[in-house]
Swiss-Prot record:
Limits of the SpoVT-AbrB domain: 5-52, 81-124
PROSITE patterns according to UniProt: SPOVT_ABRB (PS51740)
Cysteines joined through disulfide linkages: none
Superkingdom, taxonomy of origin: Bacteria
Quaternary context: Forms oligomers.
Record-given protein name: Transcriptional regulator MraZ
Pfam family, one: MraZ
Length: 152
């Protein structure tokens, strides 16, 4: 499971180094293979270990090619999907179209989301955190059916 936010750098060749604490599980459980695609609701990227991505692909396979919305979803997620592999130094290459989609510059945030990572431009991440806090403070959590029993 992946959790926590890590500040990392994008090098001049378009690579990022995955933090050391995640490398071993990625190598052992997923042979170092990761699929990167776009987030369809935010200007960030999603990084899925290969076995998690295969679950997404199985769901995508069930979507219709004749329904405009379903086809659009498939085009976005699959059209941008790139499989990459950790190199010997724990780095992965982010293809240019993906870097452009998420407006990635030198400073990046890698954010664990249990079964996947989000990859954000650092400034966009800070703005997103502010928006998340406003959303949480502005909503009565007890009125949200899925969050009614959630407590910390």
């Amino acid at each position: 499971m992946f959790r926590g936010a890590s500040a990392i750098n994008l090098d001049t060749k378009g690579r990022i180094a995955i933090p050391a604490r995640y490398r071993e599980p990625l190598q052992l459980e997923h042979q170092g293979r990761i699929v990167i695609t776009v987030d369809i609701q935010s200007a960030c990227l999603l990084l899925y270990p290969i076995h998690e991505w295969e679950l997404i692909e199985a769901k995508l396979l069930k979507l219709s090619d004749t329904d405009k919305t379903q086809r659009s979803l498939k085009r976005m997620l699959l059209g941008y999907a790139h499989e990459v592999e950790l190199d010997g130094n724990g780095r992965i290459l982010l293809p240019p179209p993906l870097r452009q989609y998420a407006n990635l510059d030198k400073r990046i945030m890698l954010v664990g989301q249990l079964n996947k990572f989000e990859l954000w431009d650092e400034q966009a991440w800070l703005q997103q955190i502010d928006e998340c806090q406003e959303t949480i403070r502005g909503e009565e959590l007890a009125n949200n059916e899925r969050l009614a029993d959630f407590s910390l």
